[in-house]
From Swiss-Prot:
It comes from Pseudarthrobacter chlorophenolicus (strain ATCC 700700 / DSM 12829 / CIP 107037 / JCM 12360 / KCTC 9906 / NCIMB 13794 / A6). The active site is at 48 (nucleophile). Belongs to the glutamyl-tRNA reductase family. This is Glutamyl-tRNA reductase. The gene is hemA. Catalyzes the NADPH-dependent reduction of glutamyl-tRNA(Glu) to glutamate 1-semialdehyde (GSA).
Length: 441
C-alpha cells in the first residue's frame, strides 16, 4: 500500500480557491472509494485555510489514477474545471505525506504558526472518515501518529504557549481597530455553532465579553448557548441584534450569508462603527461589506498577514520532534510492509512440513512416535525461520523490503500477496500441528 496526499493550502493558492475546492468535501472520500479501485482509503482535512485529501493506493502505479479520480470528483462537486482543480493541488507520496501531516498537526504549517486548533481538526478528520468507513488501517495509523506528535510538541516545547490561534489573532486585530478596547462593553453577534464558534465563545469570555448573541441557520443556537452562555437568536431577533452590535463574527460557512445591501439596511440607523470578522472559508459575510461606511471587515487573509512569528528556538525544537516522529513512523511502516513476505515464507515452510507429516502419518498413524517427529520438525522450522524473519525487519528498516520479496520469489518461487488480500491459512490435517509456536519466530 502507498500513502499519498493532495494538498491545497494558503501557502500556495488564494483562500477563495481553497473555499471553492472544499465545496461538498464531506462526500468526496466515500464517492471516490466507491468509484475507483485505485483508492483503498481516504481522509479529508478541510479547514479555514487548507483542503487536503490523504489517501492510500494499492501500489505506486495506482497513485496517478487515484489522483485523477479525486480531481474529477472534486471538479464535479465544486463546479471548477478539472485543469484548475489539478493545478491547485500539489501531490505528495511516501515519507513526504507523513512529514507534511505531522507538521500540519503540530501547527508548523498554519497561517498562525503554533496554533492549537489544527490538532483538533486533524483528529476530527480521522473520526469522520472512520464514521463514513473510508479510513484504511494505514491512514488510521498515520493520523493517530500525527495527533500524538502534536501532543509531544505541545508538551515538550514552548510552541503555541501563548495560546495563539486564528480566532485570537482576529480578536487582537479587532481590539486594535476599536475606539474602546474594552470587550466587556461590546455587543457581539456570532454566526455558527461549530468548532470555531466554540473557540470564539471561549476567547470572548476570557476577554470579559458577556453580551454575546449566537445565530445558527440550522437552528442549533439554543443547544449551543445552553452549555457556553450567550443568547440564542432566530431569524426575527437577528436583525435588531446586528443593528446594535459592535462586532459580528462569522464562523458558520453555511450556504446563507450576510449581504452588503442587507447589512446597510439593518445598520442604517446606527452611528456606531461595526467590526465584521469573517472566519468562514466560504464567507459568512459578503466581501462588499468592507466597503460600507462605518464597517471594518477582517478576513482570514487579514489574520494571516497579522499573525506574529514564533520564536526561532521553539520552532527548531518543534521541527526536530516532527522530523524524528516522521522518521520513526516511516521505519515502522516499512517494517510492517514485509509482514506479508514473512507470512508467505512461513506458509511455504509449513506447507512443506505438513506434506512431510502426511507421509509420516500414512506410515505410522497418529502414534506417539509421529507426534515426537512432528514436535521436532516444528522446533527445527521455528529455528530456521528466526534469522530470515529478523533480516526481513532489518532490510525493511533500511528501505530494502523489495529486495527481500525478490529473494523469496527467486529462491523459493514464493509470490508475496498484497496486504489485505492474503489467502486464509491452510486447513489443518488430522492429528494437527499447533502452529502458534511459529508465530513468535
Amino acid at each position: 500500500m502507498v500513502l499519498f496526499s493532495l494538498v491545497a493550502t494558503h501557502a500556495d493558492i488564494d483562500l477563495e480557491t481553497v473555499a471553492q475546492l472544499s465545496n461538498g468535501s464531506s462526500g468526496i472520500a466515500a464517492s471516490v472509494l466507491s468509484g475507483s479501485p485505485a483508492v483503498s482509503g481516504a481522509v479529508v482535512l478541510a479547514t479555514c485555510n487548507r483542503y487536503e485529501i490523504y489517501g492510500e493506493a494499492p501500489n505506486t502505479d495506482d497513485v496517478e489514477a487515484a489522483r485523477a479520480a479525486l480531481v474529477a470528483q472534486i471538479s464535479a462537486q465544486s463546479g471548477l474545471a478539472e485543469p484548475l482543480v489539478s493545478r491547485s493541488f500539489s501531490t505528495r507520496t511516501g515519507p513526504e505525506v507523513t512529514r507534511h501531516l505531522f507538521a500540519v498537526s503540530a501547527g508548523l504549517d498554519s497561517a498562525v504558526v503554533g496554533e492549537r486548533e489544527i490538532a483538533g481538526q486533524v483528529r476530527r478528520a480521522l473520526i469522520t472518515a472512520q464514521h463514513e468507513g473510508t479510513a484504511s488501517s494505514g491512514l488510521v495509523r498515520l493520523f493517530q501518529a500525527a495527533s500524538k506528535t502534536a501532543k509531544d510538541v505541545g508538551a515538550q516545547t514552548a510552541l503555541g504557549s501563548r495560546g495563539l490561534s486564528i480566532v485570537s489573532v482576529a480578536l487582537d486585530l479587532a481590539t486594535d481597530l476599536s475606539e474602546n478596547p474594552d470587550w466587556s462593553a461590546k455587543k457581539v453577534v456570532v454566526f455558527g455553532t461549530g468548532a470555531y464558534a466554540g473557540a470564539t465563545m471561549a476567547l470572548l469570555r476570557e476577554r470579559g465579553c458577556t453580551d454575546v448573541s449566537v445565530f445558527s441557520s440550522s437552528g442549533r443556537a439554543e443547544g449551543f448557548v445552553a452549555t457556553r452562555g450567550g443568547t440564542a437568536l432566530d431569524a426575527d431577533s437577528l436583525r435588531p441584534a446586528v443593528a446594535a452590535a459592535d462586532v459580528m463574527i462569522g464562523c458558520s460557512g453555511s450556504d446563507t450569508r450576510v449581504e452588503a445591501d442587507e447589512l446597510a439596511q439593518v445598520r442604517a440607523g446606527s452611528a456606531q462603527p461595526l467590526i465584521a470578522i469573517d472566519l468562514a472559508l466560504t464567507h459568512d459575510f459578503d466581501p462588499a461589506v468592507g466597503e460600507l461606511n462605518g464597517v471594518e471587515l477582517l478576513t482570514l487573509e487579514s489574520v494571516r498577514l497579522a499573525a506574529p512569528q514564533e520564536q526561532a528556538e521553539s520552532l527548531a525544537q518543534a521541527s526536530g520532534i516532527v522530523k524524528g516522529a516522521a522518521k520513526a513512523f516511516e521505519q515502522e511502516r516499512e517494517a510492517r510492509s514485509v509482514d506479508s513476505a514473512i507470512v508467505a515464507l512461513r506458509r511455504h515452510t509449513m506447507d512443506v512440513l505438513d506434506a512431510e507429516m502426511e507421509k509420516v502419518r500414512a506410515r505410522h498413524g497418529c502414534t506417539a512416535a509421529a507426534e515426537e517427529v512432528e514436535f521436532a520438525l516444528r522446533r527445527m522450522v521455528k529455528q530456521l525461520l528466526h534469522v530470515p524473519t529478523v533480516r526481513a525487519r532489518e532490510l525493511a528498516a533500511n528501505g530494502q523490503q523489495d529486495d527481500y520479496v525478490a529473494a523469496l520469489e527467486a529462491l523459493y518461487g514464493i509470490t508475496v500477496e498484497q496486504p489485505g488480500t492474503a489467502a486464509p491459512a491452510a486447513g489443518q490435517a488430522e492429528c494437527p500441528v499447533d502452529h502458534k509456536g511459529l508465530e513468535s519466530a
